[in-house]
């Protein structure tokens, strides 16, 4: 299996790295980071990730994954990226996203008539792209799998491994990375979190949204 994870400046690192850690542990699966231009990109907070190939070098993939992050905004009108996604989608077994990455799939026209999810703060905008937004950790509709925010990418990736390699392999990978969540708080969804916590998160997002998007220059 050949997996291409699209990375870009101001991505949410966990959106890419979480699924990467799951899928790279499957025997004979090759996972690589790709970007508009080969080389380093800087995630939110400054973490550097290296794209081994530029998207114009990638004609096909078994799986393509689009992470989320504040860097998604310019991608929604970036025809170079959107055209590439449409092209590579014709070759994929699975087209996937994490968090706000589903908006990019939508902008590429890949979610029309499909059930899809994403970060809880961007579910409604998915309607603008013809998608049917739903909640949940991940949603599979045809060959498209969209995951909710950040850590949901791990759940989605384990589901994908189970679909392709079987549940035993997926369980072995889960144990290998010791993915056994037991958080100290039960506030991991807006339905569970107290209203004041929901509003605090919204204020954090609004503040971060003012951060200029890096061009990588």
Residue ranges of model-derived segments:
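Extended, subdomain-level signal for the structured scaffold at the beginning of enzyme domains
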Residues: 1-95, 102-107, 123-125, 133-135, ...
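Positions that flank functional sites
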Residues: 39, 120, 141
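Active-site-proximal catalytic alpha-helix in oxidoreductases
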Residues: 100-102, 146-158
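A conserved active-site-flanking secondary-structure segment within enzyme catalytic domains
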Residues: 111-138
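Alpha-helix boundary/capping and short turn/kink residues
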Residues: 116, 150, 163-167
């Amino acid at each position: 299996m050949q997996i291409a994870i699209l990375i870009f400046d101001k991505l949410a690192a966990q959106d890419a790295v979480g699924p990467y850690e799951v899928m790279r542990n499957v025997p004979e699966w090759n996972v690589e980071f790709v970007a508009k231009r080969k080389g380093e990109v800087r995630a939110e907070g400054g973490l550097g990730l290296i794209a081994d190939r530029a998207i114009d070098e990638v004609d096909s993939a078994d799986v393509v994954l689009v992470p989320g992050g504040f860097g998604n905004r310019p991608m929604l009108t970036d025809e170079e990226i959107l055209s590439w996604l449409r092209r590579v989608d014709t070759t994929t077994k699975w087209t996937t996203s994490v968090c706000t990455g589903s908006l990019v799939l939508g902008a590429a026209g890949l979610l029309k008539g499909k059930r899809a999810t994403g970060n809880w703060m961007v579910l409604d905008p998915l309607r603008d792209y013809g998608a049917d937004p739903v909640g949940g950790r991940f949603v599979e509709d045809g060959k498209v799998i969209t995951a909710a925010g950040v850590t949901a990418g791990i759940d989605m990736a384990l589901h994908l491994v189970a679909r392709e390699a079987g549940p035993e392999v997926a369980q072995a990978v889960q144990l290998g990375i010791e993915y056994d969540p037991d958080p100290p708080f039960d506030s991991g969804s807006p339905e569970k979190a107290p209203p004041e916590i929901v509003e605090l998160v919204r204020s954090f997002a609004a503040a971060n949204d003012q951060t200029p998007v890096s061009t990588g220059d």
